[in-house]
Design a protein with these regions (language model features):
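Hydrophobic helix-and-loop "lid/oligomerization" segment in the mid-to-C-terminal part
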Residues: 1-121, 151
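Short beta-strands and strand-coil junctions in structured, solvent-facing domains, enriched
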Residues: 50, 134, 153-155
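Short amphipathic alpha-helices in soluble, non-transmembrane regions
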Residues: 94-97, 126-130
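A common structural junction motif
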Residues: 99-102, 130-136
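Conserved short beta-strand edge segments in small beta-sheet-based binding/regulatory domains
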Residues: 104-107, 137-141
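Upstream accessory/linker segments immediately N-terminal to the RecA-like ATPase cores of bacterial MutS
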Residues: 140-147, 157
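Short, low-order "capping/linker" segments at domain edges
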Residues: 156-162
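Conserved small/polar residues in nucleotide/adenosyl-binding loops
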Residues: 163-167
Length: 167
């Protein structure tokens, strides 16, 4: 049992390292292609591990707050994961792009997709047009709704702990 536990721990550490490396590579790609200026994010690499691209897409949503697609290549196809923001239905967007996709499925905030490598740029352009048309500048800002204002002088360990427990 201990041996199995150690193996699982090692696999988890490797997954975290791969996740971190892939996320860093995706951020570099976004900056290099100036995707921060777009209404959506689409990043891809031939050798990213398909088991972590959904996690990477979620991390990119946290950082850039745009509908995000992360793709990796398998033979002549890109397979990937889409994540969305409040107010934008990623499944409906993929459905509108279905003429260039081999497969897709999912729901409003998360989906999977597969497309031929020859259709990548066409898909990228179609998806960006959809997001640009349906997402306002206000939607590109991750907002938080709060119940009350607290002054700095009201904060102490007990109140912060209580607030953390209720979140």
């Amino acid at each position: 049992t201990i041996h199995l536990s150690e193996q699982i721990q090692l696999i988890n550490v490797e997954r975290r390292e791969e996740d971190k490396k892939t996320t860093e590579e995706a951020i570099i790609q976004i900056k290099d292609k100036e995707e921060e200026l777009f209404s959506s994010t689409l990043v891809y690499h031939d050798n990213w591990h398909p088991g972590i691209i959904g996690i990477v897409a979620s991390r990119l949503i946290e950082k850039y707050y745009r509908p995000t697609i992360v793709l990796t290549k398998r033979n002549e196809y890109y397979i990937g994961s889409a994540r969305s923001i409040k107010g934008f239905d990623s499944y409906k967007a993929l459905k509108k792009c279905s003429d260039v996709l081999e497969q897709f499925g999912g729901h409003k905030y998360a989906a999977g997709l597969k497309l031929h490598e020859s259709k990548l740029e066409l898909f990228r352009n179609e998806f960006e047009k959809l997001t640009n048309k349906h997402i306002s500048d206000e939607q590109k800002i991750n907002s938080c709704i709060y119940d009350l204002e607290i002054s700095l002088s009201d904060l102490n360990i007990k109140s912060v702990s209580y607030t953390h427990l209720r979140a």
